[in-house]
């Protein structure tokens, strides 16, 4: 197994650690530690792709699992923030998009076609990760609340745009 694929697996293994930190309030500074774990996991998303492309280590496993790892990480964070920081209906829309695209990719994989993530999807994921970090930090400033809401709405818009783009480019 090459390094980019190991980074993808590491990102997936970070998810339960992140969730425990988000949900167990008895751990001192749990939100800050959770943000640290989330940032490290998110950075592996950038690293695995760059390393894979630079050293010609792109694999079908990576093309399939890298976006899935992103979906799992972001979805876990959204579920942890659901209701308290993000309205439930927005979380439902975002996770529904992720499930739809995962199903779409699975159908393609059954036919021997591996659909790589597109630019809009990568942009959406990056934006969602930034939004999640801002919301978890929960800095008690009005400007920070406004930034959080702006990020939520932009993430929702990018979720819809990226789904339309993905389906339009890959429907066969």
Describe the role of every protein-language-model region.
Residues 1-172:
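Alpha-helical transmembrane bundles and membrane-interface segments of multipass inner-membrane proteins
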